[in-house]
Amino acid sequence: GNHSRRTHKPRAKLRARDNFDWFLAHQLALLLKSDDRITFQIPEATDALVPVHDTTFLLTHGDQTRGGSGIGGLWPPLLRMRAKKLQNYASMGSPFDIMDVGHWHTLIQAASNGLIVNGSLKGRDAYAATSNFSFEAPQQALWVTVPKNGVVWQAPVLVGDRKSEGW
């Protein structure tokens, strides 16, 4: 992700390593190496291809593209980025089915269109308010992937405190 990077601007070379998430993942892998129930896939690149049954997911932060605040919303930059990444990965013999991104902190569950955009656990903050981003409640993407049919069910995981929020 870009929130835990060590530099103000993202790097191109060794970008994954210039990040506290990468460091933490390696520390956890070391700590849990004797537990054979847990495996780690810690990519050295900004993207990770993850096969689940017959479906291949491309996990990427999503900050490699710009835009999303115009009249077309997030769709034009997301679809451009997906098309470019799919073309690149397919040319290397590694096509993917669904691209999963975060970056915009807006939940879009469109697996049938090859796209899942994750929401944000923390919800709205000062940056979102001063940037005039639309309000979105804290939420995360949840889906079920099955053999042969891929993603068959999707739902938001709504994050909140029922008691303090009174619901």
Describe each model-derived feature in a short phrase.
Residues N2-K13, A48:
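Catalytic cores of extracellular degradative/oxidative enzymes
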Residues L14-T46, P51-V159:
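Conserved beta-sheet core of the metallophosphoesterase superfamily
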Residues G166-W167:
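Long, compositionally biased intrinsically disordered regions
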